[in-house]
Amino acid sequence: KYYLNYSDKTAYVVDKGKRKKISVNKKVSFKNVKVAAAFHGWLSLDKQKKIPKVLKLMQFPCSDALSYSHLAEGRVDAVIQCSNKIWDIHPIIPIVKAAGGYLSTWNNKDASNAGNILVSSNKTIHNKFLKLLKPVSK
C-alpha cells in the first residue's frame, strides 16, 4: 500500500495494484473529531497539563507518515506531532494538500520547515487546535 499525489488537487492510495482517489473527511466537525497525536517525550508533563482539552481528544497513536496518510484518506481528522524532522513531513505535504488537508507548525508557520506539526482535515478544526496548542507552541 502506498500514497501519491497526481497533481496539487488529486491524491491516491494504491493497494494491491488498485488506485483509489483519496480525500480528507470534509464533513467532520470539532464535536466528533478523530485525533492521532504523540509527544514522544518532547512535551513535559508540566507542559501537557497546559493542554488538557487536547489530551482528552487524543484517540489514536501517531506514527508520522502513516498517520498523515490516514488523515489524507479521511480515517482521522487531525494529527498532532512534535519535533518532526524534514524527512518526516516533506514527503507527505503534497499528498495531504492534494487530499484537501491543512498543515502548519503549532504556531501556524510553514510546515515544510519541520518542527511541531499540526495537520487537519479542514480550516475550522485546524484553527481550533492552533488555539488549544497555543500554551505550548512557543
Enumerate the predicted regions with their spans.
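Acidic beta-strand-loop-alpha-helix segment within the catalytic core
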Residues: 1-68, 117-138
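Oxyanion/phosphate-interacting regions
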Residues: 49-54, 69-138
